Amino acid sequence: MSRYRGPRFKKIRRLGALPGLTSKRPKAGSDLRNQSRSVKKSQYRIRLEEKQKLRFHYGLTERQLLKYVRIAGKAKGSTGQVLLQLLEMRLDNILFRLGMALTIPQARQLVNHGHILVNGRIVDIPSYRCKPRDIITVKDEQNSRTLVQNLIDSSAPEELPNHLTLHTFQYEGLVNQIIDRKCVGLKINELLVVEYYSRQT
């Protein structure tokens, strides 16, 4: 299944706010309609919608998300929390959380086009897994820095999660540590996502 490229507002109207996909928010009226429908939802549909919420927020294909679930299942600790850590530590998501991009798809473009360096080397793989003490910088070229500066100026000021530090004037971000569960930027029940996949096998 390919990455979603359809109308974004259609997705947030059904699934709720997906800040990684779009900065738009569902209207209050649409929330009420969804709540009235939710009474009739089956447990399967509830799990499916949580899975879809995760997939669309992080901009993943079904195959990519399944791969992350399998990796998380083999790791020590809670599968759901490890899954969120894996997704949050992707380079495209780190750029989004630093405020260097307005959405994760936008951050992915920055990476794909060679504007981003990790520890002094260009990384053009959006799924690159960042680690504590990684230094993320914008390429030292005018078009790269102007592009990112415009995105920083356009983004609404938000408090950075404690696992990240941003030095705006140096166009530099620092990964301090693995993200805490409480700092994940999406309202999600990750256990339902794990349950969804466990029932598919």
From Swiss-Prot:
Keywords: Chloroplast, Plastid, Ribonucleoprotein, Ribosomal protein, RNA-binding, rRNA-binding. Residues 89-152 form the S4 RNA-binding domain. CDD domains: S4. GO terms for molecular function: rRNA binding; structural constituent of ribosome. One of its GO terms (biological process) is ribosomal small subunit biogenesis. GO terms for cellular component: chloroplast; small ribosomal subunit. Its main location: plastid. Pfam families: Ribosomal_S4, S4. It is found in: Plastid, Chloroplast. HAMAP family: Ribosomal_uS4_B. Belongs to the universal ribosomal protein uS4 family. NCBIfam families: PRK05327.1, rpsD_bact. Part of the 30S ribosomal subunit. Contacts protein S5. The interaction surface between S4 and S5 is involved in control of translational fidelity. This is Small ribosomal subunit protein uS4c. It comes from Crucihimalaya wallichii. The lineage of its organism: Eukaryota, Viridiplantae, Streptophyta, Embryophyta, Tracheophyta.
